Amino acid sequence: MAQCVQSVQELIPDSFVPCVAALCSDEAERLTRLNHLSFAELLKPFSRLTSEVHMRDPNNQLHVIKNLKIAVSNIVTQPPQPGAIRKLLNDVVSGSQPAEGLVANVITAGDYDLNISATTPWFESYRETFLQSMPALDHEFLNHYLACMLVASSSEAEPVEQFSKLSQEQHRIQHNSDYSYPKWFIPNTLKYYVLLHDVSAGDEQRAESIYEEMKQKYGTQGCYLLKINSRTSNRASDEQIPDPWSQYLQKNSIQNQESYEDGPCTITSNKNSDNNLLSLDGLDNEVKDGLPNNFRAHPLQLEQSSDPSNSIDGPDHLRSASSLHETKKGNTGIIHGACLTLTDHDRIRQFIQEFTFRGLLPHIEKTIRQLNDQLISRKGLSRSLFSATKKWFSGSKVPEKSINDLKNTSGLLYPPEAPELQIRKMADLCFLVQHYDLAYSCYHTAKKDFLNDQAMLYAAGALEMAAVSAFLQPGAPRPYPAHYMDTAIQTYRDICKNMVLAERCVLLSAELLKSQSKYSEAAALLIRLTSEDSDLRSALLLEQAAHCFINMKSPMVRKYAFHMILAGHRFSKAGQKKHALRCYCQAMQVYKGKGWSLAEDHINFTIGRQSYTLRQLDNAVSAFRHILINESKQSAAQQGAFLREYLYVYKNVSQLSPDGPLPQLPLPYINSSATRVFFGHDRRPADGEKQAATHVSLDQEYDSESSQQWRELEEQVVSVVNKGVIPSNFHPTQYCLNSYSDNSRFPLAVVEEPITVEVAFRNPLKVLLLLTDLSLLWKFHPKDFSGKDNEEVKQLVTSEPEMIGAEVISEFLINGEESKVARLKLFPHHIGELHILGVVYNLGTIQGSMTVDGIGALPGCHTGKYSLSMSVRGKQDLEIQGPRLNNTKEEKTSVKYGPDRRLDPIITEEMPLLEVFFIHFPTGLLCGEIRKAYVEFVNVSKCPLTGLKVVSKRPEFFTFGGNTAVLTPLSPSASENCSAYKTVVTDATSVCTALISSASSVDFGIGTGSQPEVIPVPLPDTVLLPGASVQLPMWLRGPDEEGVHEINFLFYYESVKKQPKIRHRILRHTAIICTSRSLNVRATVCRSNSLENEEGRGGNMLVFVDVENTNTSEAGVKEFHIVQVSSSSKHWKLQKSVNLSENKDTKLASREKGKFCFKAIRCEKEEAATQSSEKYTFADIIFGNEQIISSASPCADFFYRSLSSELKKPQAHLPVHTEKQSTEDAVRLIQKCSEVDLNIVILWKAYVVEDSKQLILEGQHHVILRTIGKEAFSYPQKQEPPEMELLKFFRPENITVSSRPSVEQLSSLIKTSLHYPESFNHPFHQKSLCLVPVTLLLSNCSKADVDVIVDLRHKTTSPEALEIHGSFTWLGQTQYKLQLKSQEIHSLQLKACFVHTGVYNLGTPRVFAKLSDQVTVFETSQQNSMPALIIISNV
């Protein structure tokens, strides 16, 4: 239980006090009424004695009584009515609420930190009122009157005669059978005569004389002169006198209420009295007080009788709070004791002491002795009951019967003179004067007698008081008999059916157990008495049980919370809304955030309803909000009910302040960080073959890799525009801002271009949500040229659209548990600073065609496609938290976030706006296929644009054509076949012979120092006017790798008028191309060994080309035709085809392979002289009657783009560790000997069957030959991963390695050729030695002087190697030393000697070479490319 202000040792004596009646004359009552008090009320604050009093027990032992309190009340002849008592208790509890600002106790139990009120004053008020309102009962005497004060005034004509009348009236009330109420302790009641004297108006001398007369008649100890009203009421305001009565009078004022629904019920017999008590649910305030001389009307008597039922929980409790409020209001301003001074207070206090010392206590002491003597004489004992107690209770105990074995004898009545009642009467009298030892003895004796007689009501009363007396005995001679209390409670409840007495028993026992820290037993006891017959009592007991659980040594937090919920429920049923709300709030501390979602929902729902009933609308909204924003596990129907309650409450709140700011709505959830902002118009849909550029849209998902590619492309084109330098203030253009983009700067938007904000909603409920009139909330700072700034806040989006137009979504439906985005647009019409604050909308739910609660059309209800049950207008803010800062040490050690300004765009001046459309743009190509499409550029703004460029990472994929495109007319055949190439018709004589042309790479945008990725778009006059459009051809070439390719185009353009904020704009397009296999081309180049017919020193080479058809016919390709092979080089050109016969067909079916061999020669000196102008010589070898001009668009375009992309690939460079620069130069000279700059272009046609039609596709492949003898491919080769190496844990020594050319490079330094007859006939029988002349030609392939050593000696691998059969020897000089100039050819005449016939290899001479100005480290043997075989025959 909660802590109490009083201890149990103080509580029980104050709850059971001697009762004294007061009977006043009318004049005496008038004197006290001058102070707005009755006589009994006048005495109430002074009814406790301030000093100890003494009395002697029957054994003449002195007994000390501490803090004795007496209860004086007017005589009332009607018992209190159950309905009135119930009403009074309700009002007492309602009127006692937690004090505002009271600091609660913080209890820590496990993971819980609970703020719990340490005290429960409402329960203490209820308990006090309940105990003091107990009526006088026949089976006990605790509330029976012990004495009666007869009060008259000194101003009366005959005061003594008035006393006689009052005495007779008291005697008539006590002894007349017409009055069964009130109850009197003994027939000979003490009468105490009090003479009231008004000091301010009365005659003091007369009062003294009357008092002297009284003393002679009634004795000095039986009367008293009480002087009051020392000042007049008109002087009451002159000085402030304390008002000790106000705390006692609130309950009395409650008693004066009317309009109860229970009728009067006058008790006419003792039996009826008992039966009537059975229906009492709880009793309140002091029933002894009432109106003067109204003997038939109890203060709790009901005045109206409309419903005779005594229902415990009738509707009357609903008026408790209001009636209490009215009562308080009526009493406000009344000053009690206005005519009394502090001296009068002391006189009243002295009067109570005199009455107690001289009248009441001697009377009680005398009565105890008389009762003791009566009991002794009746039982025939020789000594007093007190002295015989030990003997009586020590032996031969009567076995107590079980409660279940006893008959229901609660109606058994004893006559007033019965000895059993005399024992009980003596026990009660001893208890009232705190003589607990004697009281316990008497109760114990009476209990035995009652049980023997099976008078269960009497027995239960004796057991109850025996247990209390045993506990209160000084020194605690015996333990507290809790089983007495348990038996008494069970008897009251189950046998006697008297819940009032059972409740009193529980209240006392719980306090006794709590004082012994037996909280578990106390909680069980409190819970046991909860029942359906009284919600108020059950609520209070459950709450105290909850406090027991939390105050245990190991607090039981969840039990505390559960019982607080039960208590709150019963408080709610009892009409105690404030207490119900408090209980639920206390319990919420335990359930909140622990995953008990259903319990949380129930508590919040109840808190919301109770708060709404109490008009705490903000609290109600908050509670309902919590139900909706938490992840609920409720059913859809329940969630719908919650939502409707919330909307109803919310609507009431909003109606209180219709002109106030829009409130925040809890639903639906908004994921602010997922908010995306898009600047610009929506993308146009495809129109037939006309497809708009993909650009940027909110439908695209963010890809960091793609975003980085676009950034690099933009940087690349900006660098080209700014002559290779990226401006310091450059920032990549961002059309779509999201959580991944850089939002640290204010984004730039263009006036008259829409701003789309995508808001991510999520409905956590299982019911539909309908948002109506959904739009953005914004704030705008217009900026004009005068420099004035104006701020306008638009909360209604339709108010002034001339600044910012806003789109309104009339209906936006979100299904249960659905995530859905809404795209809302703003249309800026003025330059300035825009701040997007949030969204505003009406929140409702669909009710179908039904109206809710019969309300019909409410304000805010929407009549549209859906039928709303109810809707409320509100907003939600879009607050986006920026990224976590982690740069400086301070930022790393603290939690700081940067700004996120995606919702704060700056509206800039008008800019051009480009739209790009692609016409006949393919989605599928063969690898290397050439296709012609068209691109349309449209300026849809009011500003001209210029500087249009396109940049792509894949420039080899497309071309707009070079400068030569207009110089080459279309041939008739090309037009007829719709060929993408420029062609001319040739005659048959040119077959297999190269046709020469030339072109400059500058004409195709591949000039020196330029970036091939950035391509200017050839606009007419370089400007596109507003509203103008232009169509340009675009050739496409399928990538060499099969698969799906994503190719990015970035179009860059500027405004003719330079803007300070935005310098350029971009447009993005991503093309998706699916390529399938076509041809694989391999090529190698090697030196020709033939030195004949060579002009000059250029030399010639052979080019071997292998073409394989790798298409698997999935694209419907029947066959490929090789229509032309072209070369492009600054130094070399194809001369003729070597192996093609006239009837050789060049078509390749699936998986077929074709081989070609071509002779390549050096370009003429005139042709090669233009190398500095980036001129390339193109040689075309055609296999048909139509020449494709390879030096024109689009063939040359794609060749140059493939060349530039190849040049971008990292080349293998020699490590530079040599000591001298001359050594490096030598190495470079040697490397150049094996290098070749020859590019092969294979042009083909493919015949495709599609939809029963035959189509002709065209394409080209490129092979770039760089090194003699090294195979090159038209398709990229897979790189093998390097082998794993062991990890080294030491630093390698820095050893300088001399740079040496490779063996292959050295072998290409000198080209050798042997000239000899293939067969030679010699008559060996005539001459044994055969001499054959051989010419050795040496050709210097480098451009430096070379020293050559020719060694003719046979190389032997071991000393044992001898001349074997088939060998020959060289005659003459065995070693030659020569020096060859740059590209010089030298011949040596040699003689070979044979002694046998056979086939011999003449390729045995070894040639060593080194550069003339270098050391011998470069010497190496020159290896012949093929054996030189000679046949020696005998004739």
Curated annotation (Swiss-Prot):
Its main location: Golgi. Residues 302-312 have a biased composition (Polar residues). Pfam families: Ig_TPPC8_2nd (PF24545), Ig_TPPC8_3rd (PF24544), Ig_TPPC8_4th (PF24546), Ig_TPPC8_C (PF24542), TRAPPC-Trs85 (PF12739). InterPro entries: TPR-like_helical_dom_sf (IPR011990), TRAPP_III_complex_Trs85 (IPR024420). SUPFAM superfamilies: TPR-like (SSF48452). One of its GO terms (biological process) is vesicle tethering. The modification Phosphoserine is found at S273, S279, S309. Keywords: ER-Golgi transport, Golgi apparatus, Phosphoprotein, Transport. It is found in: Golgi apparatus, cis-Golgi network. Residues 301-321 are annotated as: Disordered. The keyword NADP does not apply. One of its GO terms (cellular component) is TRAPP complex. The keyword Transport applies. Belongs to the TRS85 family. PANTHER family: TRAFFICKING PROTEIN PARTICLE COMPLEX SUBUNIT 8, TRANSPORT PROTEIN TRAPP. Plays a role in endoplasmic reticulum to Golgi apparatus trafficking at a very early stage. Maintains together with TBC1D14 the cycling pool of ATG9 required for initiation of autophagy. Involved in collagen secretion. Component of the multisubunit TRAPP (transport protein particle) complex, which includes TRAPPC2, TRAPPC2L, TRAPPC3, TRAPPC3L, TRAPPC4, TRAPPC5, TRAPPC8, TRAPPC9, TRAPPC10, TRAPPC11 and TRAPPC12. Interacts with TBC1D14. Interacts (via C-terminus) with TMEM131 (via C-terminus); the interaction is direct and is involved in collagen secretion. This is Trafficking protein particle complex subunit 8. The lineage of its organism: Eukaryota, Metazoa, Chordata, Craniata, Vertebrata.
